[in-house]
């Protein structure tokens, strides 16, 4: 692509020293936290083969760690780019690296949306628990996620260009192309997935708070986890997509107007906001550690598998134990399981019933 639309001012990704410094710091911190964190998640879940089959949630978390880890492996390239103010690879490398980044971005947000939908169904439709454990369903969902990510990431490679042999950044043939590409990326990679996450967790929290144990310790723990996931997702991706929208509006504005000049500012700020989005790939393992609570000292390195074993979805045996947490959120079943030796499917231990619910 020989001719590129450029906003007034001719700013590039490297124009602002502050954005470069912020971006470098976020990238280094993301790699420091995210590479070992996601590696640990892959190590914990990849070889875990419970008798009843790996829970769908665990499979989604595994692929989320793979997607996040893949993009974090590219951080040395971006650190070199920002610190040396020159792209270390050529034109082909420019397109290929940003394609992998976009692929990881779409896979991560789609997997996050699926994970929130799975949790919502597990709470509101517990009778679907056997189907949610189906390996065939997991394979179909994952195939759909990765195929969709492969297709949605194509524009990131098409519109990347090496400017002056030094700067790898977006290159659109016209303002209309720029506005369409940036708006579509924000719609498919933020607005729709984030809306799904918010909707699913809103329904989940409403259902859990309606349960008798929803105001206790587990209600607080689940509420904090949900809030952390949604807050991290929104805060870390919002600046990147705000720049997208700013540049999309600026591209369609009159060339001499103030909005058009804001497009150049957005271009210069993109290095920092992109690095902040990278940081989102390192947050999930940290959230898993905080979610584990007292499982961490008791289960040690295997706390993650114990966390999913306690979710009820991983349990084998009788069908009455499928979706244990979800079924026991209803007031009626909660009363039935309060006493010892009363025929409770979990073995007649009321304390164990409460403990199982709290481990979800």
From Swiss-Prot:
InterPro entries: GPCR_Rhodpsn (IPR000276), GPCR_Rhodpsn_7TM (IPR017452), Leukotriene_B4_rcpt (IPR003981), Leukotriene_B4_typ-2_rcpt (IPR003982). The keyword Cytoplasm does not apply. Residues 338-350 have a biased composition (Gly residues). One of its GO terms (molecular function) is leukotriene B4 receptor activity. Residues 351-360 have a biased composition (Basic and acidic residues). The chain crosses the membrane at residues 25-45, 61-81, 97-117, 141-161, 186-206, 225-245, 276-296. Glycans are attached at residue 10. The keyword Transmembrane helix applies. Low-affinity receptor for leukotrienes including leukotriene B4. Mediates chemotaxis of granulocytes and macrophages. The response is mediated via G-proteins that activate a phosphatidylinositol-calcium second messenger system. Belongs to the G-protein coupled receptor 1 family. This is Leukotriene B4 receptor 2.
